[in-house]
From Swiss-Prot:
This is ATP-dependent Clp protease proteolytic subunit. HAMAP family: ClpP. PANTHER family: ATP-DEPENDENT CLP PROTEASE PROTEOLYTIC SUBUNIT. The keyword Protease applies. Its main location: cytoplasm. One of its GO terms (molecular function) is serine-type endopeptidase activity. It is an enzyme of class 3 (hydrolase). It catalyses: Hydrolysis of proteins to small peptides in the presence of ATP and magnesium. alpha-casein is the usual test substrate. In the absence of ATP, only oligopeptides shorter than five residues are hydrolyzed (such as succinyl-Leu-Tyr-|-NHMec, and Leu-Tyr-Leu-|-Tyr-Trp, in which cleavage of the -Tyr-|-Leu- and -Tyr-|-Trp bonds also occurs). Belongs to the peptidase S14 family. PROSITE patterns: CLP_PROTEASE_HIS (PS00382), CLP_PROTEASE_SER (PS00381). GO terms for cellular component: cytoplasm; endopeptidase Clp complex.
Length: 205
């Protein structure tokens, strides 16, 4: 068993279980599986390929279950790998159900793009959440010609991300480029004014 496996096993012990009584007896679910029945998906922690694959699989499953019912993604993430985040983004746009996004805690970097990519009018934030947008971070070691190739690629990626952010927020490309030159933190109220979200949720109605 590797240290990684031990860490997974340790974390799995912390996941609450829910017991439901049915006509066939009792059935137990981990809390995330139970919430998935309510079409709720959690995007938490760093966005990597493994996390993205799980989120994508859950969205595809919920679409297969009911293509007309909304999906809810709760986000508390510092961001992560661009390609992993884009796989989530593209799947949100690919599937038929509307995807509602809710920021709880923080939505930074790629997580901010996923948050603002939710269905227009159904992008939410809790009152004390924060959102951070910035330009992509990259680093590469190797031959000069390879470094040049990767530098050109990250510039193209930056341009694409800025275009998507501008589309979803209705901000100009110039504004997005200026604001993402450095880490740009926004409160829930600032995020509404910026166009990243639509509503702050203080309590259930």
């Amino acid at each position: 068993m590797t240290l990684y496996d031990k860490e997974i096993n340790k974390n799995s012990l912390l996941i609450p279980m829910v017991i439901e009584k049915t006509s066939y007896g009792e059935r137990s679910y981990d809390i995330y599986s139970r919430l998935l029945k309510e079409r709720i998906i959690f995007l938490t922690g760093t966005i990597d390929d493994n996390t993205a694959n799980l989120i994508v699989a859950q969205m595809l499953f919920l679409e297969a279950e009911n293509a007309k019912q909304d999906i809810y993604i709760y986000i508390n993430s510092p961001g992560g790998v661009i390609t992993a985040g884009m796989s989530i983004y593209d799947t949100m746009k690919f599937i038929k159900p509307n995807v509602n996004t809710i920021c709880i805690g923080q939505a930074c970097s790629m997580a901010a793009l996923i948050l603002t990519a939710g269905k227009k009018g159904y992008r939410y934030c809790l009152p004390n959440s924060r959102i951070m947008i910035h330009q992509p971070i990259g680093g590469y070691n190797g031959q000069a010609s390879d470094i040049e190739i990767h530098a050109k690629e990250i510039i193209k990626v930056k341009r694409k991300l800025n275009e998507l952010m501008a589309f979803h927020t209705s901000q100009s490309i110039n504004t997005i480029e200026k604001d993402t030159e450095r880490d740009c933190f926004l409160s829930a109220n600032q995020a509404i004014k910026y166009g990243l979200i639509d509503t702050i949720l203080s309590y259930r109605t």
